[in-house]
Amino acid sequence: MTITTLTLGMILAAYLAGSISSAVLVCRLRGLPDPRTAGSGNPGATNVLRIGGASSAAMVLFFDMLKGALPAYIAFRLGIDQVALGAIAIAACLGHIFPIFFKFKGGKGVATAFGAMAPIGHELALALMVTWIVMVLISRYSSLAAITTAMLAPIYTWFLDERFTIPVAMLSTLIVIRHRDNIHRLLKGEESKVSRKKKG
């Protein structure tokens, strides 16, 4: 990896972009409980689905993915090498996980990581989306779907565009590590399943 002023600037910009908590902002705008203290306590799309319904969750998902996609796409267009590209994508995820603007209490980084992978190609984006949806439908566990999709992402990338296998593997490793508590709960049968807010 070649460290340049441009690379360092992109890493900082990606972290700051990732630090904008879509879940907290959407919940504030829509008069919903703070996702850091309500539901599962995780400020991400799945928890917003639980406490605010599908439309709010969709907004959070879109903006969380955008936080990863924009820095990765800009870095790619600037010709930054693949390993540095992975570092920039990870910086966006770390911003989401440890946001400087929200007392370093963030989400799991799944949507942001998948957003960073999406610019690699439509085929990869579709494969990731289908894998996640199928796993959720089968298991009803968002965490298991995220872990499974993350583990398969480097394999998909190897077949579709092997140049980006290393940065995708870096992101996948971060996602799995971030879900270590979920893995323990899954093994104990204590993990919460996906649900949505019931209409009153």
From Swiss-Prot:
Pathway: Lipid metabolism; phospholipid metabolism. It comes from Shewanella sediminis (strain HAW-EB3). One of its GO terms (biological process) is phospholipid biosynthetic process. HAMAP family: PlsY. It is found in: Cell inner membrane. Coiled coil: none annotated. Probably interacts with PlsX. GO terms for cellular component: plasma membrane. Belongs to the PlsY family. This is Glycerol-3-phosphate acyltransferase. GO terms for molecular function: acyl-phosphate glycerol-3-phosphate acyltransferase activity. It is a multi-pass membrane protein. It catalyses: an acyl phosphate + sn-glycerol 3-phosphate = a 1-acyl-sn-glycero-3-phosphate + phosphate. It is an enzyme of class 2 (transferase). Catalyzes the transfer of an acyl group from acyl-phosphate (acyl-PO(4)) to glycerol-3-phosphate (G3P) to form lysophosphatidic acid (LPA). This enzyme utilizes acyl-phosphate as fatty acyl donor, but not acyl-CoA or acyl-ACP. It holds the Pfam family G3P_acyltransf. The keyword Calcium does not apply.
